[in-house]
Amino acid sequence: MEKIEHTTISTNGINMHVASIGSGPAVLFLHGFPELWYSWRHQLLFLSSMGYRAIAPDLRGFGDTDAPPSPSSYTAHHIVGDLVGLLDQLGIDQVFLVGHDWGAMMAWYFCLFRPDRVKALVNLSVHFLRRHPSIKFVDGFRALLGDDFYFCQFQEPGVAEADFGSVDVATMLKKFLTMRDPRPPMIPKEKGFRALETPDPLPAWLTEEDIDYFAGKFRKTGFTGGFNYYRAFNLTWELTAPWSGSEIKVAAKFIVGDLDLVYHFPGAKEYIHGGGFKKDVPLLEEVVVVDGAAHFINQERPAEISSLIYDFIKKF
């Protein structure tokens, strides 16, 4: 880890913390919630050893990157704008793009808005979400899964913050990062995420040192920046009306664990394997379902995921 360089880049009106290592073709890694650049620590080291320039920022609202206070500052347009500006500042014309969780969602939008800047895409966990012409994203989730669905619970400012603040940050991160129940998370307001089981001991792939790194950053920032991605998602729906029905025109590979909660959302498997995904992403070359892996797959199965990424991008 000591070889990883840390810099701050000014982009799109914010200061962005960026971790990077290596030289060669650039690979841009986008993390999810509740995570940081650190979620890609294994992939950074592996891809750099294979002759790539591996770059992983803390996204807007996370870690050592600025966190604007308003939820309306966290649309896909803001996040993609940050990343295009980052590439411009680094003098990089095109990248291989790798995303997970919210990072995967933003990677889909990056490819939708600026396919000219992407050589190829590897996304983990979160498939492309087709824009319904009349139903906003969060409204659709609420209709399908009800108010207790975690995505809906994160909408009201202050509520999720109080829930996450009711236990120590390290304990909450242990609960969240080790979730293995593949069912969509239903979190009754009176119980909250604090009711989730705390693993003891931690799984082999997540150390106390890892938790300490994540917790040290989230103790400083809180979780509001991350929650704001959920709170801005209906606004993203409004702003992406011009792209309604558009296809992703980038060569892509998709990887998901068979215990990933997103893989078990209503209709997800049918979309991924039944032709809808390939229709929306016509250059989708491969879907890999990893047996026995849950949501935080890049950390749980680092060697396997690193190899799957490398095997795809080396073709370009």
UniProtKB/Swiss-Prot annotation:
Lineage: Eukaryota, Viridiplantae, Streptophyta, Embryophyta, Tracheophyta
Binding positions (an epoxide): Y150
Catalytic activity: an epoxide + H2O = an ethanediol; (24S)-24,25-epoxycucurbitadienol + H2O = (24R)-24,25-dihydroxycucurbitadienol
Quaternary context: Homodimer.
Uses in biotechnology: C.sativus and L.esculentum expressing S.grosvenorii genes SgSQE1, SgCS, SgEPH2, SgP450, SgUGT269-1 and SgUGT289-3 accumulate siamenoside I and mogrosides III and V, thus providing a strategy for vegetable flavor improvement or for heterologous biosynthesis of mogrosides.
Other observations noted: Mogrosides, the major active constituents of S.grosvenorii fruits, are a mixture of cucurbitane-type triterpenoid glycosides that have been proven to be powerful and zero-caloric sweeteners and can hence be used as a sucrose substitute for diabetic and obese patients.
Family, similarity comment: Belongs to the AB hydrolase superfamily. Epoxide hydrolase family.
InterPro entries noted in UniProt: AB_hydrolase_1, AB_hydrolase_fold, Epox_hydrolase-like
Extent of the signal sequence: none
Organism: Siraitia grosvenorii
Name under which the protein is recorded: Epoxide hydrolase 2
Residues in AB hydrolase-1 domain copies: 25-302
